[in-house]
Amino acid sequence: MEQRRIVHIDMDAFYASVKQRDDPSLRGRPLAVGRGEARGVVAAASYEARRFGVRSAMPSVTAKRLCPELLFVPARFDVYRSVSAQIHDIFSRYTPLIQPLSLDEAYLDLTDHLGAYGSATLVADRIRADIHAETGLTASAGVSYNRFLAKLASDYRKPDGLFVITPAMGPEFVAALPVDAFHGIGPAMARKMRALGIETGADLRERDIETLTRHFGKAATFYYGISRGIDHRPVVVNRERKSLGTEQTYLRDLTSEADAHQALTQIAATLWGSAQRRQLQARTVTLKVKYADFRQITRARTLSAPVPSEEVLLETGQSLMAPLFPFVPGVRLLGLTLSGFHAAESPPCDQMELLF
């Protein structure tokens, strides 16, 4: 039986990193996304904050006590969703088999979609490079022959790393790990396992299926498998996304119409290419503008028929942008989004030689 090629991509401190990207004055500073008041909770923490022990789901007062210099910023889910759409568009260039787990992580099945690269490891590295080039953010990747091990691998070299667990490595890699490092085993279950003398993957592997079933019920089969590096769960493709967008943040604020039109031309070309790769037809075009003072506005137009060409996409975007001139203050980000689309049937992909 041929081994699968599964990649798990996990963005590094996603919410906090997006804020630090968009506000350079915050780079290198301990940052928490959430409310800083007495009853607030940390939604996410930058790596600078994590060095002090600040973690997500931690009460804000506890986080502030651990890190007095901690700066709290509000969550910006519209921005996170927009960046997530960019990232998932990058994924779709390499495989249609994508299972998003959240805005900032996903499984990709590359088994039959290695393309000219011939290697899931090379594809994963290319995806990470594309993400950094197009969003300014870093991602970690894990490559393996099943979902469980791919997710473990993506954690192994964080942040901004890549790790591969081959079939030869899998069982012993799992054996050496403490059970509370296993995805799918939460704190309560880990405590229960430790009470039974199960501290590591090797300990878990020593228990037969009957013993595991007696203590863990229906979950026993899953635990029995992962302790041996076995996980047959497929990458489950979610329903089609409802929108597809491209945006760009500029080092120098856009102030002139000429610069803005040139920038929008590039964005429209990128977005149209993404839609064509996915064979999507859309009727609604949305323009996003973020000013230098971080104010943000959107304008949308729904056409009577699907956007037929890159030229019409650009013309629609420009007509939405025209009433916004002059740009005062300048514009630091422009974006276009397509929505209200459906996907045509995709042609079958070529079967490639399977290599890690």
Swiss-Prot record:
- GO cellular component assignments: cytosol
- Gene giving rise to this polypeptide: dinB
User: What name does this protein carry?
Assistant: DNA polymerase IV
Its biological purpose: Poorly processive, error-prone DNA polymerase involved in untargeted mutagenesis. Copies undamaged DNA at stalled replication forks, which arise in vivo from mismatched or misaligned primer ends. These misaligned primers can be extended by PolIV. Exhibits no 3'-5' exonuclease (proofreading) activity. May be involved in translesional synthesis, in conjunction with the beta clamp from PolIII.
Entry cofactors: Mg(2+)
Q: List the disulfide bonds.
A: none
**One of the GO BP terms on file:** DNA-templated DNA replication
Co-factor note (free text):
Binds 2 magnesium ions per subunit.
Active-site residues, Swiss-Prot/TrEMBL: 105
